[in-house]
Amino acid sequence: MKNKNSEQNTHSTIGEQDIHYFHEGKHIYAYEFMGAHKACEEGIEGIRFTTWAPNAKSICVIGDFNYWQVEDKNYMEPITDAGLWSVFIPNAKNGDKYKFVVTNKDTNHYVYKSDPYAFFSELRPNTASIITTETQYTWSDDKWLEKRAKTNYYDNPMNVYELHLASWKTKNGKFLTYDELSETLPQYIKEMGYTHVEFMPLHEHPLDASWGYQPTGFYSVNSRHGDIIGLKRLVDKLHNNDIGVILDWVPGHFCKDQHGLIYFDGSPCYEYQEPTKAINKGWGTHNFDLGRNEVKCFLISNAMYWINEFHIDGLRVDAVSNILYLNYDREDGQWIPNIYGGHENLEGIAFLKELNGVLKHTCKGVITIAEESSSWPDISTPIEKGGLGFDFKWNMGWMNDTLRYISLDPVYRKYHHNLITFSMVYHYSEKFILSISHDEVVHGKKSLINKMWGDLWNKYAGLRLYMSYMIGHPGKKLIFMGSEFVQFVEWREYEQLQWQVVDQYESHKQTLHFFKKLNDFYHNETALWQCDYNHHGFRWIDADNSQQSILSFIRSSKDNKQKLIFICNFTPVTYYDYHLGVPDAGSYKEVFNSDNLEFGGSGQVMATEIFSSPQSSHGFEQRITIKIPPMATLVLKLIK
């Protein structure tokens, strides 16, 4: 997958084809020659620095190697008229800190900038880039990569654990290193039964409270946890435990701290020229100019960098709506329509298609996931069929509706029954992932357990009911860390999760056990993931029982040999002698019950098989009569 261009120009060791494709916006390995790279020129070893700054008058490299002095010999030379600059510095070496002094050609004003392509950077509050040439790692995940290339994720289990590294666990209040995380995280994820971990952004960012979503160093590994080798070792360890790694990736906007990409050459460079398009007031950031060739190279090469160098298995693309809409988070008069008079960002659309097209062509088995909150059509439709080409899309509508529903007093749920059923009306329009992410447990939104209605018992029961319903609902799954053991406080990025409650309180231990059993149940039952995006895989038994707030539906495998019947009771009422239509004659056995005593429930379980009778119900010729426990999900399976 490496770039093989080798033709040289007269100015540097950068290939002529590299330069051509870079300015054409078609280079997908720009990180191989942009930034700081070890070189030997005319028999002398050193570092070649290369950057792009089309409106620069001059650029000087300063750093540890020259005592941070501006010297004539360290000024870059312009390679092209389109803004590519480069210089070879003999005495620069691995580990040296450095910056670029960029002078604007119109104002003569100069700025001190970090290297946009730096592989490593100083820990905040310091902002220098660090020469990093020792990045080789001996991987041991060949079997995983081979399996990944052959996997069809649509008909395989996908149960994602979303994770913020800095606050998952700490050591005496300090960040764990990637190596320390390697000793505990893979084992925990595997024991809990998750198939993937999703890391919130791992590129360098100055503000902890931004969670990584306002980056400055897109190619720089988050220095809070260690170095490049440490992160590679962590990913390798996860792969060796059969755990996929998804990375939150932010290609729409960037932090406006002065050492970063903002006005890199003293004028709009990585951002749009037009202020109404460039300035993102809502987030206090700048939007990338996605129509500029060199910016597209920067971003698509960045995606390739994380995938190639760190063996990342998928990218969750952040804030896709901000890329698609010119009027995103803007009032009338604060945005300029496109050439057709619409609000669609044509450059953003083209960029997303190009990104997904490149990854599909070059990175077999790597997936892309859109975090997109609007009703934009065909997000996960292939490019050749007119879509954007993402593999999956987060189902924000399902999340909003169902979280609202479970917060209601059960007395009033009958009047809002559509909130829990409406998702199946549009489910097959996209390849949805059901996500309960970090955004839902911060900023006054309450922790997941505190979203539940009722006293403490009903909150725990409601959580088990809701999670079991989620497992049964078609679509892949994602849950944010801490929910699995019932963290009561909202997520706080500045401290570790409240792991101590698992040892202190039986209810937390029981819920952690519940999540493990639920995840194992999901993984072991083909019907729960093989036909997520095929109408064959789901059928309502009764979607309309609003009076009792009970849902019932069937999940089926491709060959129809496995069928699971879900009954979800969203009230604290036990229903006796409940008649339920079933698709097949025979005996049915309980295979999962969220009311089980071992989970902290009331223990109203079905100890014996139930036989169907030839009586019509819910459109079926057979029916069973069961007891439905309160605030619980009951799952039955035909056994003979």
UniProtKB/Swiss-Prot annotation:
InterPro entries the UniProt entry points to: A-amylase/branching_C, Branching_enzy, GlgB, GlgB_N_E_set_prok, Glyco_hydro_13_cat_dom, Glyco_hydro_13_N, Glyco_hydro_b, Glycoside_hydrolase_SF
Catalytic activity: Transfers a segment of a (1->4)-alpha-D-glucan chain to a primary hydroxy group in a similar glucan chain
CDD domains reported for this sequence: AmyAc_Glg_BE (cd11322), E_set_GBE_prok_N (cd02855)
EC number: 2.4.1.18
Molecular functions (GO terms): 1,4-alpha-glucan branching enzyme activity; cation binding; hydrolase activity, hydrolyzing O-glycosyl compounds
Gene3D superfamilies the record matches: Glycosidases (3.20.20.80), Golgi alpha-mannosidase II (2.60.40.1180), Immunoglobulins (2.60.40.10)
GO biological process entries: glycogen biosynthetic process
Pathway entry: Glycan biosynthesis; glycogen biosynthesis
Signal peptide start and end residues: none
A GO cellular component entry from the record: cytosol
Residue positions of the active site: D318 (nucleophile), E371 (proton donor)
Source organism superkingdom: Bacteria
Top enzyme category: transferase
Record keywords, A-Z: Carbohydrate metabolism, Glycogen biosynthesis, Glycogen metabolism, Glycosyltransferase, Transferase
A Pfam family hit: Alpha-amylase_C
Function text: Catalyzes the formation of the alpha-1,6-glucosidic linkages in glycogen by scission of a 1,4-alpha-linked oligosaccharide from growing alpha-1,4-glucan chains and the subsequent attachment of the oligosaccharide to the alpha-1,6 position.
HAMAP family cross-referenced by the UniProt entry: GlgB (MF_00685)
Family the entry assigns: Belongs to the glycosyl hydrolase 13 family. GlgB subfamily.
Subunit structure: Monomer.
Protein name: 1,4-alpha-glucan branching enzyme GlgB
Species: Francisella tularensis subsp. tularensis (strain WY96-3418)
